[in-house]
A protein has these predicted regions:
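Catalytic cores of the polymerase beta-like nucleotidyltransferase superfamily
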Residues: 1-238
Length: 238
């Protein structure tokens, strides 16, 4: 099916109104600095616009890819989320998938990556510009290839990449933990990655190592206690 550009643009405007609250929620959940420019790329935007074009129901769940940039953009950039005609950085009517040249041209910045095409997007960013920082990542749906991607606790950090190679089976566990933590325990997503790391690694280490790790990762004493408490509560249930 082919749509005229005007139809697509109108669908984008309608979709943005439904996407915006979800984006705001994720931005708040990640505790991004105020006035941080946020980009939404991938299937989340694609699905929202497609539903508007076909007059079908759209139920936002997870955002596929979020990229944040702290500095201002040039006048000719049409990819800012806050601009009326933006489409999350994806070229209108051409492809519904992120392109390496887009990353290279616009996203020379730290990135926060969430979502379905996790491995493709990380590789596009990492191999095209190996100096680029990946601040956080969470594969909600799983890998789209057999590549092994770096994962760790992914607490937001502005000064370094926090990664650790893990086996691909971590992804399926990560999804279960993410749902469990958020829905059953109401635990912040960032803390769930720390707990997941502990569950994956602390069987081979002493409790002292665990406390040292959490002290290093989480400065807030109350949050640190919560992580350790939930670690013990959940360890035998997952």
């Amino acid at each position: 099916m082919i749509w005229y550009l005007e139809d697509v643009e109108r669908a984008i405007c309608r979709a943005r109104k439904k996407i915006a609250p979800v984006v705001d929620g994720v931005v708040n959940d990640l505790n991004l600095p105020k006035n941080t420019d946020v980009f939404v790329v991938g299937g989340f935007v694609r699905d929202a616009v497609f539903c508007e074009l076909t007059n079908t129901k759209f139920e936002p769940k997870d955002i596929d890819l979020i990229l944040s940039k702290k500095s201002d953009f040039s006048q000719n950039n049409n990819m800012l989320w806050k601009q009326e005609n933006s489409f999350g950085g994806i070229k209108l009517g051409l492809k519904f998938f992120p392109e390496v040249d887009i990353f290279d041209k616009y996203f020379d910045c730290p990135a926060i990556i969430v979502g379905q095409y996790f491995d493709f997007n990380v590789n596009s960013i990492y191999y095209h510009n190996k100096t680029r920082q990946i601040l956080a990542a969470a594969p909600f749906y799983g890998f789209t290839s057999n590549k092994t991607i770096e994962l760790e606790s992914f607490l937001i950090s502005s000064d370094k990449i926090e990664t650790l190679y893990k086996e691909p089976s971590l992804v399926s566990r990560a999804l279960k933990f993410q749902v469990l933590f958020r829905e059953k325990y109401g635990i912040d997503a960032r803390l769930s990655w720390t707990i997941l790391y502990l569950l994956q690694n602390m069987d081979k280490q002493t409790e002292q190592k665990m406390f040292e790790y959490t002290q290093q990762k989480i400065k807030d004493e109350n949050l640190r206690k919560q992580v350790i408490e939930q670690y013990y509560n959940i360890k035998t249930k997952c």
